[in-house]
Amino acid sequence: MAGSSSRNASSFGAEEDEDGALISTRGLEAFGRKVTTTAGHLIGPIDPTSSTHYQNAMSDLHKQLRRPNLQRSVFSFAKTTPTDLVRSKLSTSEIQYRALTFLPDELLRNIPENENSYSLFQGFQASLPEAGEEKGKKHRRRISRGRKLIDNASEGGSEGDGPPSVAKLKKEKEALNHRLEMMGIRKNMASSEIHGIDNKIANLNSMRRIVLDRLAGLEQEESMLEHENVENRLEEAQEQIEDAEALGKSIVGAEEGDDVENSGMESSFMSESIYEKLPSSASTSSSKGSRRHKTIRRKSMPILHEHFEPGSSIREIQAHDDMVTALDFDVPFGTMVSSALDDTVRVWDMNAGRCMGLLEGHTASVRTLQVEDNIVATGSMDATIRLWDLSKARYDPQDKIKEEQEEGEEDQLAFGEALEREQQTHIPQGTMQDCPLFTLEAHVDEVTALHFRGDTLISGSADKTLRQWDLEKGRCVQTLDVMWAAAQASATMGSTEGTWRQTGRLPDATADFVGAVQVFDAALACGTADGMVRLWDLRSGQVHRSLVGHTGPVTCLQFDDVHLVTGSLDRSIRIWDLRTGAIYDAYAYDAPITSMMFDTRRIVAAAGEDMVKVYDKTDGRHWDCGIGAQREASEEMVERNIIEKCRVKDGYMVEGRRSGMVGIWSC
């Protein structure tokens, strides 16, 4: 038998050598022959020398195999594939679990190192304890109440419980340690969340800066497109065509007249009628001047300043060489007009930070001015009021932009700040010579306050009068004597409410008799040096109401539909209710108020410091805006940086300082 086994093995090895590279059924056939040989050896004739154990075992197995159920299972098992065999051993859920939880080695190599000292399971435990802890606290309170009742009931018979057991103390210690561990894990989790939030905020801030730069570029491009002068060029071309047609007709008519009169005037080469019909040099120059470039009003409003942080500096302009006495602007990033003690009135392009030109005509410093669309009104110490139309300016921002684009990038990088300072100090000549409209002359002393709306202009002067002007006719239509009105009010009311009030302080030489005025239709508000605010009716020329409260000269005021806000040298700002005449609110600063203005949200005031005082009307918050707000607490205030005038519109604030510098801020 051993020989047959070795022979079979040798034959099987030979067959493997022949077809080793192929997978066939020969292996199974060889395995079957081995099983048959072994079975024949076990079931064959009984060898007296061998044991009967194998024979008995095979007999029992033969009886079991003859059962039908077992035969069917064996036959079905023979038909199954290895895949079916695996599926029969594992359930569907187990197969899915193994497929989902299997991780290849590539992913395992890329797992980052964990810096946390706690595991994922511990973090999961720490994120769930709130409800359980509340339930445990309630349960412990109930148990403690029950124990107290039992102790109280057993106080008479027993001497009390003994010392707590060691096991109980160990259990409480483990619970406390577990709670401390969970608290430490929660602290680490909260710290990780804070770091994650900080990273997200930093990413969002960087994205915001990128979008903000994009918005600034879009507004710059929008401004350039609006100054392309296509409409002006079209108008000029049409006017030139009309002039050429008119000139051609005049020449033809002159030639016909020359033919008729040629017999009597042979010595002349052209008739006099030609000189009458040809445009003169003066008219030609004036027509050319009227066709000069007109400043295009912006069709869209800038919104860049709305996205700056409150208190952010937008631009600084060295507007003058002396203290700023008045300033105003039309719209954010629009046109600003400023005046100073250097006796100049300058017009500025705030979008580019460049001077557009000078408004020349006053013989003294301008104390007050107002900008409304294209119209500018200026009141001077020479007792005159002049009106200007900025739409007739010859300023072209594209010329300066083209010059800058022609310069090299390296020069711009090296001398960028010097170029910006040069642009601010450079004053174009002759750009505003067509802007003057007319001059209003009636006051006999310096004009200290003015305000116009529509065709009505009100001016206040040191001659103690208010004058109403009709801007269509250019003449004074009414004169209001403040002292006479105060005396009339005193005589009518029989009290001292309307009389000229002494503030109880030494007279201030710098205080203007008429500090501020504002007109709306027939209503006029006027603040004077006696601290009174008088409300006039222009139809009757009488004082309708007097508001008493300030103890110093009123320097500024402004009203809307409901409230009137006034600022005074007594360091206070008062908000009045126009319906009742009572004080609605009031607050004070550490120095006199020299300028004030409000918009829909905030009240800004210049109070003798190097920063503008801002009062948020919506939430009642006071805060500072300006270079003083960015100054260290240990640094001293520079007197040259003290702010004298401030204006605000739609969160876009402009302030003028004693040094002549003008700062533009977002508030």
UniProtKB/Swiss-Prot annotation:
SMART domains: WD40
Pfam families documented for this protein: WD40
Membrane topology reported for the UniProt record: Peripheral membrane protein
InterPro entries with a match to the protein in the record: G-protein_beta_WD-40_rep (IPR020472), WD40/YVTN_repeat-like_dom_sf (IPR015943), WD40_repeat_CS (IPR019775), WD40_repeat_dom_sf (IPR036322), WD40_rpt (IPR001680)
Coiled-coil portions: 166-253
Composition bias, Polar residues: 1-11
Superkingdom classification of source: Eukaryota
SUPFAM superfamilies listed in its UniProt record: WD40 repeat-like
Chief localization: mitochondrion
GO biological process: mitochondrial fission; peroxisome fission
Region (Disordered): 1-20, 131-167, 276-295
WD repeats: 319-360, 361-398, 442-481, 501-546, 549-586, 588-625, 628-666
Composition-biased stretches (Basic residues): 137-147
Localization per Swiss-Prot or TrEMBL: Mitochondrion outer membrane
Gene Ontology CC annotations of this record: mitochondrial outer membrane; mitochondrion
Entry keyword set: Coiled coil, Membrane, Mitochondrion, Mitochondrion outer membrane, Repeat, WD repeat
Chain ranges passing through the membrane: none
PANTHER family xref list: CCR4-ASSOCIATED FACTOR 4, WD40 REPEAT PROTEIN 12, 37
Protein role: Involved in mitochondrial fission. Acts as an adapter protein required to form mitochondrial fission complexes. Formation of these complexes is required to promote constriction and fission of the mitochondrial compartment at a late step in mitochondrial division.
Family: Belongs to the WD repeat MDV1/CAF4 family.
Name of the protein described by the UniProt record: Mitochondrial division protein 1
Organism of origin: Sclerotinia sclerotiorum (strain ATCC 18683 / 1980 / Ss-1)
